[in-house]
Amino acid sequence: MTHPLVYEINTRCWLRDLSIRHGRCLTLDTVPETEFSEWQRRGFTHLWLMGVWTTGPRARELAQCDPALIAAYDALLPGWRAPDIGGSPYSIAAYTVPDALGGEAGLQSFRQRLHAHGFRLLLDFVPNHLGVDHPWTREQPDRFVQSPGPAAAAFRVTTPAGDRWLAHGKDPYFAPWTDTAQLDYRRAETRAALTALLQTIAARCDGVRCDMAMLLLQEVFARTWAEFPCPDAASPGEFWAEAIPAVKKQHPDFLFLAEAYWGRERQLQLLGFDYTYDKQLYDELLRGHGAGVQEHLLQSAPEYVASSAHFLENHDELRVAGALALAPHRAAALTVLGLPGLRLLHEGQLTGARYHAPVQLTRRPAEPPVPEVVALYDQLLAALARGGVGRGPAQLIAPRAAWPANPTHRHFILVLWPGAPDTFTLVTANLAPHPGQCYAPLPVADLARRNWILRDLLSEEWHHRTGPELQTRGLYLDLPAYGAQIFHAEPDD
């Protein structure tokens, strides 16, 4: 059992940065070997190429005239020019790789090189909508949610059957995405077409991150689009319950990751998703609410945590280096990386990048690495790998109070990773801005029959403990504010 360590890359900006750094135009089929070596050193299992698909001219035009986006470009890239704006990679005109990124052949070559280095490739699947430039808007308008006439959330397209008004994609709590066209999952033909499209994507990668996956749930979709009725009877059942098995029948190891919110995560897991976003964990960590983190993790079913995607950053969120000081950043990073499930790291996170670039940009400002953040992730990733974290089953542990009237144990996160016979690793973090103490119970087979050496993989610290003591009381922990330790235990024979 492995727990994926995924690295998200902004493909368009990354290739542009690489080209500048190496003094020549680089595409997916000419990525330098040094990139693969660095990913191996970090221990990644999957690369997520965010934004690899084709956007159209209308999407780029809309991205260049939106006032809110223009303000963001001005703040981040003063003096930006039209070529710096590629349009939203989630306004997809075609699920093909543009020549500027290396084309389909470049993607195939890149995937082969990833496999040769032991990595797997994730790509985007945006099931809720397509870009306004997609040919289906003209050729297959019945696949989209439609309005009988002009509407604020719709746009006009000319089709062989005359003009139609198609709804823009949206989620029910925000304004429509005006560069998109909303697919209609009440229609059986739409579902079949999207399943077939997903099959073509699955033939070119090893997994997909499904954008806003909960919007397709029948209850959510019916509520969102009640004012745009479908003339046909709604198809029964959930789309994901049909599409995921269809893909896995052809590609059994294919990975499905859902961007999901609103408490819909477990429902999507039960419909077949391997992993779903854990936004509640992210929110509690960024809020600095250690007790809330512990409560969320311990009250969640173990299978839910192990089927969740844990992160401190992604392309939608602010940079963690700008949100947390170094000490809480380190404790939060260890929490995310030490949990069972999928662990997601974002390009720039490991070097302390602070600028959050809108996804419409194909260029971003250069940021020198922050040595302290680089060292933080170098140390954590190396120590976790040495301790076997990310391999095999893991167990969240409820800490016990160190003594009466000491509530500081409520801020501790404890994760036990059994290793080879007679070894285990305990990941510990104190998510409080003050020192804390607790006892860590250790549900380890034959614990009391051995004496143990516990070495902290983040320092030179080590301890001898007797098995009966650990069995009876647990491991005593006394950590400073935002302290963290990774104890690897072996028998002391």
Residue ranges and their predicted role:
Residues 1-493:
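Active-site and adjacent substrate-binding regions of carbohydrate-active enzymes
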